[in-house]
Each structure stands twice: as C-alpha cells, then as structure tokens.
C-alpha cells in the first residue's frame, strides 16, 4: 500500500518522518492509520501530477476515515484534482461536500469563487450578460465568505470585489 515517495526536499522528508512517528505513537485505530496513509500517499501522488493515483488513494481514505474534519480535507483535495482537470462541476460537488463537514475551509470557498468567476468570464465571452452577472455574483458571495475566514488572504479577490462594487458586509470594508 505505501507509495514510494521521492522526498526530494528537506520539508517533504521531514513531513514523512514526522507523519510516520505520529502514526506510531498516537493511540489511533488501524483504520485511522490506514486512512492517513492513503491520504498522505494521495497528497504525494497529487504533488507529482499523478492525479489518477491520487484519486484512488483519496477514495480509499474516504472509505476508512470517520472524522468529519479529516474527511473535509480529503474531499477538498479531490475537488482540487477535478478542478485541475477542468471538471468544474465535479470539483464544485466535492468542495461543497467538504464545506458541509467543515465550514471553515476558506480555500474551498476561494476555489468555488474562482470557478464561478471563470464561468462568468466564459459567459461574457459568449455575450450572455445575464449569466455572467449571476456567476460573478456567486463568485463574490464565496469570496466574501473566504475573506471573512482569512482576512489577510485573497488580496486579488478583495481588489476584484472592490473594483466591481461587490465588497459587502466584510468587517473593515
């Protein structure tokens, strides 16, 4: 089961060693350890662009992982892969599933907004103004939520919200 990791840099090597130590010393069940191992292997495959392998590992981790918080990150990473492959509808589904389990995932909120913004741009190019407005408004809604959770992040989104007049109800604005 364990994926052979290249660990070309110090941080990756350190993470792998620490993760292995934590797995050995924490009082966790066999299933929890196995789920984490699949998750770690999924992250490794994903970082190397091996998306099919990453998805296999994430799906195995989902079968075993019971903790909602941990499941939210697995779902988020699955969404990342689908978004990277241009499968935006599937990506949105997984981001939303992750948010149902953990509403404090600003990166998922941001990525949902990015997809809606992209769809808004596509609608403009197709001269579908009504759809573009709807998509841009949805993007604004999700960016506002992300910014509320992580006010120092998403500067480009904050600038876009300001320049388009969509900055609303965010503390300090």
UniProtKB/Swiss-Prot annotation:
Tell me which domain of life the UniProt entry assigns to the organism this sequence originates from. Answer: Eukaryota
List, alphabetically, the GO terms of the cellular component aspect.
chloroplast thylakoid membrane
TPR repeat boundaries on the chain: 35-68, 72-105, 120-153
Pfam families attached to this UniProt entry? TPR_1, TPR_8
For membrane topology, the record states: Peripheral membrane protein
Q: Which Gene3D superfamilies does this one have?
A: Tetratricopeptide repeat domain
Q: For this entry, list what GO says about its biological process.
A: photosynthesis
Location comes to: Plastid, Chloroplast thylakoid membrane
Which pairs are disulfide-linked? Answer: none
- Its main subcellular localisation, reduced to a broad class, is plastid
| Entry keyword set | Chloroplast, Membrane, Photosynthesis, Plastid, Repeat, Thylakoid, TPR repeat
Q: Which SUPFAM superfamilies match?
A: TPR-like
Q: Which InterPro entries match?
A: PSI_Ycf3_assembly, TPR-like_helical_dom_sf, TPR_rpt
Family note: Belongs to the Ycf3 family.
Function, in words? Essential for the assembly of the photosystem I (PSI) complex. May act as a chaperone-like factor to guide the assembly of the PSI subunits.
- Name of the protein in its database record: Photosystem I assembly protein Ycf3
Taxonomic lineage is:
Eukaryota, Rhodophyta, Bangiophyceae, Bangiales, Bangiaceae
């Amino acid at each position: 089961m364990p994926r052979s990791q290249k660990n070309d840099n110090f941080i990756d090597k350190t993470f792998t060693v620490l993760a292995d130590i934590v797995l050995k010393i924490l009082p966790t069940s066999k299933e929890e350890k196995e789920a984490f191992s699949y998750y770690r292997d999924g992250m490794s495959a994903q970082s190397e662009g091996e998306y099919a392998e990453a998805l296999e590992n994430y799906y195995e981790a989902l079968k075993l992982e019971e903790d909602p918080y941990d499941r939210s990150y697995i779902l988020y990473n699955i969404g990342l892969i689908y978004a990277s492959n241009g499968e935006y509808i599937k990506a949105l589904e997984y981001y939303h599933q992750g948010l149902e389990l953990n509403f404090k995932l600003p990166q998922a909120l941001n990525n949902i907004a990015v997809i809606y913004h992209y769809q808004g741009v596509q609608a403009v190019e197709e001269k579908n103004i009504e759809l573009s407005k709807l998509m841009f408004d949805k993007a604004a809604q999700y960016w506002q939520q992300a910014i509320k959770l992580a006010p120092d992040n998403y500067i480009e989104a904050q600038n876009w919200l300001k320049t388009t007049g969509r900055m609303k109800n965010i503390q300090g604005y």
